Amino acid sequence: TWNIINANIFKEKNKCKHDIIILSSKDELIERKLDEFRPDYIFFPHWSYLIPNDIVKKYKCIIFHMTDLPYGRGGSPLQNLIVRGHTSTKISALMANEDLDAGPIYMKANLSLEGTAQEIYERASKIIFEEPVNPGSFCFHHI
């Protein structure tokens, strides 16, 4: 919910120049719906699932990953960083491609790993929506 709250705050602050979809569950990622909507971008903040290659090839999919990529590629990045004793990391924004967390990186922003997991995720969400990949104006749509 904190992700959607921050997405809605960001939406209210910006005029629409691009249509962007923010997906928060795997059930929302339906190619037929995407084909009807034809988004300019699809943002995947805190996404835990593989994105189907058909969607990656057809749309500009931007993933936000909670490590200083290429370090930490793969699943459970927050848990893996904490287990390894890290106290800070970076949020990396990258274009999805057919390889896991390996596309071109557009942005990196510092993220403290101090506090509870909830506090860390809330800070990460604020970074994602306050420092977007393309600092123009966006319009967020939910499917």
PLM-predicted stretches and their roles:
Residues 19, 38-42:
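Short active-site oxyanion
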Residues 1-2, 24-26, 45-46:
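Structural motif
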Residues 30-38:
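Short amphipathic alpha-helix with an adjacent loop that forms part of the alpha/beta core around
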Residues 41, 45-143:
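Donor/substrate-binding cores of folate-linked one-carbon enzymes
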Residues 17-29:
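A short beta-strand-loop structural module common to alpha/beta enzyme folds
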Residues 1-13:
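N-terminal beta1-alpha1 ligand-phosphate binding loop
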Residues 6-7, 30-31, 50-53:
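Short, well-ordered alpha-helical microsegments
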Residues 11-15, 98-99:
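Short, conserved catalytic or adaptor-binding loops enriched in Gly and charged residues
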